[in-house]
């Protein structure tokens, strides 16, 4: 067994979230890395402790790297002393370790996050100090009070975890060699392929769609629907963090551009006219930005970990 301490805003929601992740054996909440050895809920403003979740996990079932990727899924790493509606030093973000060997793993994940975001993150990285177990009524708070306040979606624990470290972006020269002219123009130059006359508009087999530039999984075929727009349409991504969103005012229109996380490839746009029963979104994606992998080939191509999440 191993342990790590994570601060990420109100500890009620963060504890419930991590309690749902396979391999996490025990969670408790407390106050960490303050200026003095003792504190309580009424004093944390004065002692500068952070609301923190203590995780004990089985390294054979979930790694520290995976724990951290789950963590970054539900925090805003750029926000200072604020998560959701909660404001104050006690709601700062931080990763606090007790095993010196963990520091290198944490630093690597931090570096990857900063590279993806293009700026330094506001998450503390420190050895654990002055940890105080929180009062009993805070422990498993949302299990005792299912309708209680929570600033995160704890069901995000059930979304597939896609590790961006497995899907590195090739160099521009490699992309020019690997991709067709249309694939390169769409993904690297934000071009748009012709509607209806593209590879996957009418494809509805079981499987997954991955970023053509990196192989990072983006969409389940089960979330694809016929929209009539002429391009592949999806109601949601495999996991929300695999996509990036940008304001697009090109061609005299105001749209939300969708790009891939690891490859930074232009994929298409997202609109709010999708099926209401599936959340109301329509991800309108260029076939040229995707590669389809049939369900029967997923294991051979390294995507077996996603099979359990397919509809």
From Swiss-Prot:
Gene3D superfamilies: Peptide methionine sulfoxide reductase (2.170.150.20), Peptide methionine sulphoxide reductase MsrA (3.30.1060.10). InterPro entries: Met_Sox_Rdtase_MsrA_dom, Met_Sox_Rdtase_MsrA_sf, Met_Sox_Rdtase_MsrB, Met_Sox_Rdtase_MsrB_dom, Mss4-like_sf. It catalyses: L-methionyl-[protein] + [thioredoxin]-disulfide + H2O = L-methionyl-(S)-S-oxide-[protein] + [thioredoxin]-dithiol; [thioredoxin]-disulfide + L-methionine + H2O = L-methionine (S)-S-oxide + [thioredoxin]-dithiol; L-methionyl-[protein] + [thioredoxin]-disulfide + H2O = L-methionyl-(R)-S-oxide-[protein] + [thioredoxin]-dithiol. Its EC number is 1.8.4.11, 1.8.4.12. GO terms for biological process: protein modification process; protein repair; response to oxidative stress. The active site is at 10, 284 (nucleophile). Residues 172-295 form the MsrB domain. PROSITE patterns: MSRB. One of its GO terms (molecular function) is peptide-methionine (R)-S-oxide reductase activity. Pfam families: PMSR, SelR. One of its GO terms (cellular component) is cytoplasm. In the N-terminal section; belongs to the MsrA Met sulfoxide reductase family. Has an important function as a repair enzyme for proteins that have been inactivated by oxidation. Catalyzes the reversible oxidation-reduction of methionine sulfoxide in proteins to methionine. Involved in protection against oxidative stress when the bacterium enters the host bloodstream and required for maximal growth under aerobic and anaerobic conditions. PANTHER family: METHIONINE SULFOXIDE REDUCTASE, PEPTIDE METHIONINE SULFOXIDE REDUCTASE MSRA_MSRB 1. NCBIfam families: msrA, peptide-methionine (R)-S-oxide reductase MsrB. This is Peptide methionine sulfoxide reductase MsrA/MsrB. It comes from Streptococcus gordonii (strain Challis / ATCC 35105 / BCRC 15272 / CH1 / DL1 / V288). The gene is msrAB.
